[in-house]
A protein has these predicted regions:
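Glycine-rich phosphate-binding loop of ATP-dependent small-molecule kinases
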Residues: 1-216
Length: 216
């Protein structure tokens, strides 16, 4: 199973990705993690990427795709993978499509976890995290037993600065502007599968599993 996950902030992609990892026994691959790993160990690709980063420039799509394909060649990805956070643009999607075709590893599906902006704001603006154990709560949907205090270790919870409503709405607007062409790209290839992610996590998981039944 070779998957790409799309969805705005607050859609619950991370939760669903972990469930898919467990179901299919395939790795979840983050391009951010790949890039950091190459740079830290000073690989050939990492040295090239570092040069762009040091100049304050974006790492070119071609270089990112080469890093992704290098990761997909690892033994744990032979039976499939989950790409989260890449591609973000149509040129990246085209480059990935070409590389996967050459490797005879075409995508199985592109899952779009759909939620309204209002729901995303409710989820993110109410999100608080324990700085000690990293457990995450939602004051509306999954609150701690005691107000803004972690159930596990009693540490006061903290909220990310960019989780205020105004910033969240800006992030959502940017996301939709960037990904609308990408969704159209995958829709044209009959790969896009839309999943209503406004319901509870367990129901989203059920809908995701149902959507993937029969997909190879």
């Amino acid at each position: 199973m070779r998957l790409v996950l799309l969805g705005p902030p607050g859609a619950g992609k991370g939760t669903q990705a972990q469930l898919l990892v467990d179901r299919f026994d395939i790795p979840q691959i983050s391009t951010g993690d790949i890039l950091r790993e190459h740079v830290q160990r000073g690989s050939g690709l990492g040295i090239q990427a570092r040069a762009y980063m040091d100049r304050g420039e974006y790492v070119p799509d071609e270089l990112v795709v080469r890093m992704v394909m290098d990761r997909l060649a690892q033994p744990d990805a032979r039976q499939g993978f989950i790409l989260d956070g890449f591609p973000r643009t149509v040129p990246q999607a085209v480059a990935l499509e070409t590389a996967l075709a050459q490797a005879e590893q075409p995508l199985s599906a592109v899952l779009k976890f759909a939620i309204s902006d209002d729901m995303a704001v409710r989820r993110l603006s109410n999100r608080w995290t324990c700085p000690a154990c990293k457990r995450t709560y939602n004051l509306e949907f999954k609150p701690p037993a005691n107000d803004r205090v972690c159930d596990t270790d009693g540490v006061p919870l903290e909220r990310r600065a960019d989780d205020d409503e105004l910033t969240v709405r800006r992030r959502l607007a940017l996301y939709r502007e960037q990904t609308a062409p990408l969704e159209a790209f995958y829709h044209e290839r009959d790969l896009l599968v839309a999943i209503d992610a406004e319901v509870r996590e367990a129901e989203v998981a059920t809908r995701t599993n149902d959507a993937l039944d029969g997909v190879s």
